[in-house]
């Protein structure tokens, strides 16, 4: 399985607009949003805004970086 990330701007009605689509074999499996400075010490981390398929309905974790997010996604969709 090939995982890919595509940068996007996400309309969140908040300062957290920097986003990333997570694709598995060219299928959308998740939307991640980078937390803004208003989140204090969590600023710069990535939040699972929404998951699809096997990621739908799971707890919405916060990842230190995209590598950590990639590992988490790969474990759950394989």
Per-segment meaning from a language model:
Residues 11-13, 25, 32, 65, ...:
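Compositionally biased, intrinsically disordered low-complexity segments
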Residues 2, 20, 31-34, 47, ...:
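Acidic/proline-rich low-complexity IDRs
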Residues 10, 15-17, 48, 64-67:
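Intrinsic disorder/low-complexity signal
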Residues 30-58, 76-78:
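Short aromatic-glycine-(Arg/Gly/Cys) micro-motifs in beta-strand/loop hairpins
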Residues 1-27, 55:
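Negatively charged, low-complexity tracts enriched in Asp/Glu with abundant Ser/Thr
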Residues 61-78:
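A short, charged, amphipathic alpha-helix used as a generic interaction element across diverse proteins
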């Amino acid at each position: 399985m090939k995982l890919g990330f595509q940068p996007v701007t996400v309309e969140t009605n908040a300062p957290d607009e920097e986003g990333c689509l997570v694709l598995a074999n060219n299928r959308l499996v998740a939307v991640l949003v980078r937390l803004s400075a208003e989140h204090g010490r969590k600023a710069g981390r990535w939040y699972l805004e929404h998951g699809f398929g096997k990621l739908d309905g799971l707890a919405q974790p916060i990842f230190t970086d995209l590598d950590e997010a990639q590992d988490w996604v790969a474990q759950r969709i394989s």
